[in-house]
From Swiss-Prot:
Pfam families referenced in this protein's UniProt entry, alphabetically: CTP_transf_like (PF01467)
Keyword Transmembrane helix: no
Catalytic activity: nicotinate beta-D-ribonucleotide + ATP + H(+) = deamido-NAD(+) + diphosphate
EC number(s) from the headed UniProt entry: 2.7.7.18
Task of the protein: Catalyzes the reversible adenylation of nicotinate mononucleotide (NaMN) to nicotinic acid adenine dinucleotide (NaAD).
Name of the protein described by the UniProt record: Probable nicotinate-nucleotide adenylyltransferase
């Protein structure tokens, strides 16, 4: 197979990244390395339909993610959802990305366990696997049970070894991640109370937060 015909392996990890933190980044890096991805794209959401409105502006969240991935070869940023003047539906993003790839390229949607369990509430969720494989990040402390719709889907589409998934799309597998007890909510609360978030976010992200006075409590 010539280099021009080589199958590309692309992952996407969406989120509000309000702000991006070491938990996001460590999960992204672990998935990229485990799966041998050519690229894992962090994809900031504009107005996610299933989440609260982000606390800071889209351009600030995008800038922080760009700062966070600088110098990490396998991680990149995809801003397409911020360029839409409507809610961010994952199916629209997958269709858009898939249209840019070759037919046999593999596309992996990376989801946390809680997000995966909430899939039946997503817009056109039954069509997701037409465009991608799904990698579910599992934590040892995950205690949410999947709904029946997902149990049936897992029975039909589950692959026990994530690295063995073949074809451009269609399967689901689980990836164990390093448990890091850090959340964007926790970081926002610390910043609002005037406490340090050093070592919870990359230094470049902390510098951006401080320079732009983000997440401070209102006077």
């Amino acid at each position: 197979m010539s280099k021009a015909q080589a199958v590309r392996r692309i992952g996407i990890l969406g989120g509000t990244f309000d702000p991006v933190h070491i938990g996001h980044l460590r999960s992204a890096l672990e998935v990229a390395e485990l799966m041998g991805l050519d690229e894992l794209r962090l994809l900031p959401n504009a107005r996610p339909p299933h989440r609260d409105t982000p606390q800071v502006a889209a351009q600030d969240r995008l800038a922080m993610v760009r700062e966070a991935v600088q110098g990490v070869a396998c991680l990149s940023v995809d801003a397409r959802e911020l360029e839409r003047d409507k809610p961010s539906y994952t199916i629209d993003t997958l269709e858009s990305i898939r249209a840019e790839l070759a037919g046999n390229d593999q596309l992996f949607l990376v989801l946390g366990w809680d997000a995966f369990c909430g899939l039946p509430a997503w817009h056109r969720w039954e069509e997701l696997l037409q465009h991608c494989h799904i990698l579910v990040l599992q934590r040892p402390d995950a205690d949410v049970e999947p709904p029946d719709e997902l149990r049936n889907l897992l029975a039909a589409r589950s692959e026990s070894d994530p690295t063995a998934m073949s074809g451009p799309a269609g399967n689901i597998s689980f990836v164990w991640q390093t448990p890091l007890a850090v959340s964007a909510t926790q970081i926002r609360q610390l910043l609002a109370s005037g406490k340090s978030v050093r070592f919870l976010v990359p230094d470049a992200v902390l510098a951006y937060i401080e320079a732009h006075e983000l997440y401070r409590a209102p006077n």
